[in-house]
Amino acid sequence: MVVTNACAPDPRVMRHAVWMQQAGYQVTVHAFDREEQHPMSQNHQGVRIMRYRVGRVPYGGTVNTYRGIRRFQRTVIRTLTHDPPALVYCHDADTLKIGCALKEAANIPFVFDMHDLQHTWIRYAAPQSRLRSLISGQMKQRMLSRARAASTILTSSTQVSDVSSRGFVQWLQHHGLDGVSIENRPLPPFGTVKTPSEKTWTVGFIGRVRDLKAFELLVSAVKTLQPHERPKIRVAGDGTASAKVRTMLMDEVENGTLEAEVSGAFSQDDLPDLINELDVMYAMYAPLRGNILQGALPVKMFDAAAQGVPSVVNDGCLMGDLAESEGLGKAVAWDDAVAVGQALLALRAEVVELQATGEREHQRWLAAMAEVLAFLQ
């Protein structure tokens, strides 16, 4: 398996790696330690994680990011050419070059797991930029061309009904490719289920902190509530916007308008305790991120629901359709601070239930991978 993050952790990557191991295969995850701060070799439930260091590389859509990923790709191709695997499992579009190179050189099959629409991220910092739009279009076409060589394509969302918003499966179909949705739902056992508090309450965002506008909306939404109704804001996670978000929230605390707590990166083992602090999960994103409208589903919505915590998400897209169809929370229009505030308040005492878990997704994965696994035998 190949992934361009440090896999420290990447729950989807490790979940699929463990499933491959349970199917009877030895699995090595080739991961890119961009910040060079994790063990270079690690074992997780029998899965080896091999981390590469090719110089410190920033996250984001910069030239240095692109060059760093190219160095990582070349290094992994050399490694796997020297010791060829039976299968290459490509996590996201920026690893497809590796799968295609091994297939061309040694006829090794590869699986493409499209977590996200990677080509949309380069436009995030400047969505009106013609240059970024051009580069994004080139990345998209390159991804589609390479994906056609995959033995199987997996992705992370599909529409919930014939009349709902589209997911990534439908996006692939629109571009002439077939994919199977394996959603990022957690596996039991789960952490402690939410117990509503009659006194104070907390709204949280647990995960990568990249979208400053989402936090600006959250602050505005909370400030539309009466002071005695306002929740504490809890943010946990690192990311490209984490410093700005921390500063913004601490300024509000200093001004006496909000109560907030901010912490940095956390491990997967910390997640249940973090969610246990919350009454409502905030999972809204600026729609200018193309993948939001095209079918992205926030993992934090599923993780929160597994512990009874409802979420507020974007409406007009798949995450809103799924949240409301499964009773996992409320969908609200982007940039309507009053509506977001009222949705948060309405969910304060709600306890939800995640009925479809990662166990269902495991069965879907086995069905989707059946032909590939049969070929390997």
What are these regions, as identified by a protein language model?
Residues 189, 335-339, 348-377:
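A charged, aromatic-enriched C-terminal amphipathic alpha-helix characteristic of glycosyltransferases
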Residues 206, 232-245:
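Glycosyltransferase donor-sugar binding loop
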Residues 74-81, 97, 101-105, 118-119, ...:
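Membrane-proximal helix-turn-helix segments that form the acceptor-binding/catalytic region
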Residues 154, 186-188, 194-223, 234:
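Conserved donor-binding/catalytic core segment of Leloir-type glycosyltransferases
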Residues 1-37, 41-42, 159, 183, ...:
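N-terminal subdomain of nucleotide-sugar transferases
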Residues 11, 213, 267-274, 281-302, ...:
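Nucleotide-sugar-dependent
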Residues 118, 159, 167-168, 175-192, ...:
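Short beta-strand->alpha-helix junction loop in the catalytic core
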Residues 244-275, 280:
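Nucleotide-activated donor-binding/catalytic signature segment of Leloir-type glycosyltransferases, i.e.
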